[in-house]
Design a protein with these regions (language model features):
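Helix-coil boundary and N-terminal low-complexity module in membrane systems
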Residues: 1-111, 127-130, 134-222
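Alpha-helical transmembrane segments
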Residues: 111-126
Length: 222
């Protein structure tokens, strides 16, 4: 019993170390890319690193190995991740402006109804934003294929989608209640939880707890 507890505790500590190292790597590489060019490649590198950790047999990667995986992916993703991430950021800006205009300047039932629709769209976009980087880390496919697959997951995997939205709300509450969590683990903690939810409940080939893969699909290298 004590031996099993010791092994479980060691693995848990290694996981926390991995999440912490990824958080530091995200901060450093985001600044390395002058923020505007470094953030989205950091998101892609973080999810690829977590995918590698989840698929590892012993899940005992050292900090140096975690950093090396992250840095290598970040360099390779400098162009593609920005081409993918900035249109997503524009969608958020447009949706936020529309929601603000309709919600705070509503004058009738129609305006209130539209603001409600925009709120639902914001939840869908939130789930999409959290899932799409995991899907993108798992498949070496075209952007449109990644977008279509992510949208299909949102509809076809309602439990996974609801867990993602709940995770986002929980992360915001936790950051507000315990700011130290944000300082130590940053975005890497909810990003890891997103990867784990997809790994456990998403049932996508190549990143499935049951380890199923399908022929004809190009998977990302672990």
């Amino acid at each position: 019993m004590l031996a099993r507890f010791s092994v479980a505790y060691e693995r848990f500590c290694r996981l926390l170390l991995t999440i912490f190292v990824v958080n530091i790597a995200m901060l450093v590489h985001t600044l390395l890319g002058a923020v505007v060019l470094g953030f989205f490649p950091s998101c892609a590198a973080a999810q690829t690193t977590f995918r590698t950790w989840l698929r590892a047999e012993d899940r005992s990667m050292r900090a140096k190995e975690v950093w090396g995986i992250f840095h290598g992916v970040w360099k390779n993703e400098l162009k593609q991740a920005n081409l993918f991430g900035w249109p997503l950021a524009v969608c958020w800006v447009v949706l936020a402006i529309d929601y603000y205009m309709m919600n705070w300047h509503a004058r009738g039932t129609f305006d209130v109804a539209v603001s409600g629709i925009l709120f639902v769209l914001a939840l869908v976009l939130l789930a999409f934003t959290m899932l799409v980087w995991v899907v993108r880390a798992n498949y070496d496919e075209r952007p449109l294929w990644i977008v279509r697959t992510t949208l299909t997951m949102i509809v076809a995997r309602p439990l996974c989608t609801l867990l993602q939205i709940g995770l986002a709300l929980l992360a915001i509450l936790a950051w507000a209640q315990w700011p130290g969590l944000l300082m130590v683990f940053g975005m890497s903690l909810p990003m890891f939880c997103t990867a784990w939810i997809v790994y456990s409940f998403g049932r996508i080939p190549g990143m499935d707890i049951h380890d199923r893969e399908q022929p004809g699909i190009r998977y990302a290298k672990s």
